[in-house]
Amino acid sequence: MDDKVLVTRSSMPPFEEYVEMIRPLWESHWLTNMGTYHKQLEVELKKYLGVPQLSLMVNGHMALELTIQAMGFPEGSEIITTPFTFISTTHAIIRNKLVPVFCDIKLSDYTIDEDKIEELITEKTVAILPVHVYGNVCNVKKIQDIADKYNLKVIYDAAHAFGEKIKDTGIGNFGDASIFSFHATKVYNTIEGGAVAFRDENLYKKLYNLKNFGIRSEEIVAEVGANAKMNEFSAAMGLCNLKYLQQNISARKDRIEYYIDRLSGIEEVKLPDFRNAEITYTYGYFPIMFNAEKCGEKMRNYVYDQLRLQNIFSRKYFYPITADAACFKNKYKKVPLENARYAGDNILVLPLYPELEFININKITEIIKKTVQ
């Protein structure tokens, strides 16, 4: 058994395969600025995700931040979003000088509660920014219906949902844009990286300029942009990892099924549900939620500590919820967020990666059983 079991482990191709992939870079000396591998990866990912347009970025955060910027929302406008997400989602709104309006979530799947969105809409609302949390897909139809009714943009944070589908339609086809993260901790990684999927060809041109300092031509800088270009080493890693993605997903599924088999029947613990036949899952996370009413409000933290004593590292995703982050707590509109806070207080994400040994899953689940029962 490994000495240390981390919550995740980066997927990597065979070493020699990656070396051969990057060897031509020593000949071309073209290391960034939309090189050959960058262009090739955009084509391959468009095909894999089944989306009409795709723009690669240096990371998922910049993909989201620049997409919001590209929409051209007036300063001070409001974007309705979830507080149960990684802090990057909220930062991207605020860094664009916009106002996050937090909407509570559903405890069934931890995604934004679409039935509570409409009551939060004001004359300042310009967009909805839902998150496919842990790969659980939002109610895209109802969210789009609301957006159409009020003429709002929909930007999905799909960082947890790369490669997922709804009835054979790639997740990147919903809303006005979908953001993906290719961070080293994700199911699919380019070491660091991200992308935006969308339909509007004009948005591609806008994002192309924005990720290159706003430069439109050698002598024209048309807008204030950023340096958000993916480099060739990351693109090469992405091309290599794409070959092994299905193998990676299959191994993750096997381990999730083993977790569920070992933990099913424990009434103090809510397990994730991957049984929706309309969804093609990619199994990025294994979150469990402790029933505070049955096992106490501190059980999640206690289990976390017990695992850590055995050199097993789980994560409290997402605690605190972004609405309670110290950097902007109490700065924005107060909305009841009981479900989001309950989830933040009681969810623990367990280790999951293709090479995770089943003997380690046995140890993890035994610790959980002994602790809660």
Q: Where are these predicted regions, by residue range?
A:
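PLP-dependent aminotransferase-like
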Residues: 69-149, 153-158, 165
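Structural detector of well-ordered beta-strand residues that form the stable sheet scaffold
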Residues: 55, 80, 101, 154-155, ...
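Glycine-/small-residue-rich active-site loops that bind phosphorylated ligands and cofactors
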Residues: 85, 108-109, 135, 186, ...
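Phosphate-binding glycine-rich loop
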Residues: 30, 34-78, 92-95, 102-104, ...
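N-terminal "arm"/small-domain region of PLP-dependent enzymes with the aminotransferase-like
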Residues: 1-31, 351
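Active-site PLP attachment segment
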Residues: 173-209, 232-235
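Conserved active-site segment immediately N-terminal to the catalytic lysine
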Residues: 156-190, 217-222
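PLP-dependent aminotransferase class I/II
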Residues: 36-44, 48-52, 115, 127-131, ...
